[in-house]
Each structure stands twice: as C-alpha cells, then as structure tokens.
C-alpha cells in the first residue's frame, strides 16, 4: 500500500472513531439520569423523491419506561398518548379517538435510546457519520434482523443541548425529520400527561378496556 494511501486510510479510521466517540458521548451525557423529557418539535415528511408531504409542529413528552405524548398543534390538532399499555390517537376535528394495545412498534422507536439507552446496541446496529452535519454529531441506527421495527434506518443528531434532530426512513423511502428544542429534563409532569380519558361525545374506535 502506498504511504499516502495508508495514511489516508488511517486518518479516515481515526476521524471516524473520534466522531463516533463524540456522538456516543453526547448520547451518554444526554441520557445520564434521564427519566423524562418535555420539549417542542417541528416535523417534516418527504417522499422518496424528496417532495415535501407535510410540515407540522407541537409538543412532545417522554417518560420511562414506555410513556409518551405527541401533541400536534399545526397544521391541525392531533394528540397521541401512550400510557404504557395502550396508545390513544385523538382527532379533535373528527371528535374521534382510536385506541389499541401498545406493542413492539413503539418499543422499537429510535427514541427508546433516550429513555432506555441499554437497549440501543441490543436492538440496532450503531454506526457513525464520519463528519458533523448541520453542526451536529450523528449516530445512525439500523434495526437488527430480529427486531420488529417499522423503519429502515434512523439517525440521531446531537448538539450542545442534547438531541437536536432525528431522521427516520421507512420501508418505502419516506423520510421524517424531527427537530427538537427547549428540552426540559425530568420535569414534574401533570398527573394526566400520559393518560387519556375520552370526553363525553367522543367516538371511541377500538378496545378501551
């Protein structure tokens, strides 16, 4: 191997290792002692050709072990609540809520790495992007073959305030990019943050019991 080529290979390997260490360190620092998160998000969905299908924004809350709340405010309201046993999807405009058992689909979400980082290497093949992108250090997660995941690949981008961005590519090439801001660590959640009780007049679809 030529000296220049050998140097290039070694330099690339060293840089990639450093980038991975930096990104993994960002994850470890962000998740240390983490029991819950509350923040704002903006989301963009594009098809396999890069055409924008939807822009949305709202609030997200996560808590160990399996609770989450996605509260979409724009362009239309929608509420998704997981209480650890069931997932409720409420559409105010339709006055309808759909409820189903909470299963592996949620447990295999990339965000599981935040509130249960011990599952990261168990569920995913973890790699790094060799150089920062958008000013962030990135970890790429590819579901292992025996993992019942609903996506092909996901990436977590970390900045000075922790997780700043998440990208998810599904089976048909659709890409969802979520930017996070205003994270509050281990907040005192209201008692009903991860509970949903249908109001009178709301049509319930599914098994609520």
Curated annotation (Swiss-Prot):
Its main location: periplasm. Keywords: Chaperone, Periplasm, Protein transport, Signal, Transport. Participates in the translocation of lipoproteins from the inner membrane to the outer membrane. Only forms a complex with a lipoprotein if the residue after the N-terminal Cys is not an aspartate (The Asp acts as a targeting signal to indicate that the lipoprotein should stay in the inner membrane). It is found in: Periplasm. Monomer. The lineage of its organism: Bacteria, Pseudomonadati, Pseudomonadota, Gammaproteobacteria, Lysobacterales. CDD domains: LolA. It comes from the Bacteria. It holds the Pfam family LolA. Residues 1-21 form the signal peptide. GO terms for biological process: lipoprotein localization to outer membrane; lipoprotein transport. This is Outer-membrane lipoprotein carrier protein. Belongs to the LolA family. The keyword Hydrolase does not apply. The keyword Transport applies. GO terms for cellular component: outer membrane-bounded periplasmic space.
